[in-house]
Amino acid sequence: PRIAISHSNIVNMIGQLGAVFTKHQINIDKMVNNSKGELAYNIIVCDILPQDVTELVADLYAIASVKKVRVLNQEG
């Protein structure tokens, strides 16, 4: 499964995203980050995601600079 996240291109953004995945005990298998000016985009590939990703997505949106979260290839 993958999660796509668009956000402001600011210091410690990757650290904040990683902290959310750590909180939910989700291993990040691969992370791709790209930015242009003030905007950035991450695609995070995970080994597994919980069947209900509502709390994970809410915690990602709780990061002030996150603009959009999209769960891709969620099974179940």
Outline where the language-model segments fall.
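A conserved regulatory-domain signal marking ACT and ACT-like small-molecule sensing domains
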Residues: P1-G76
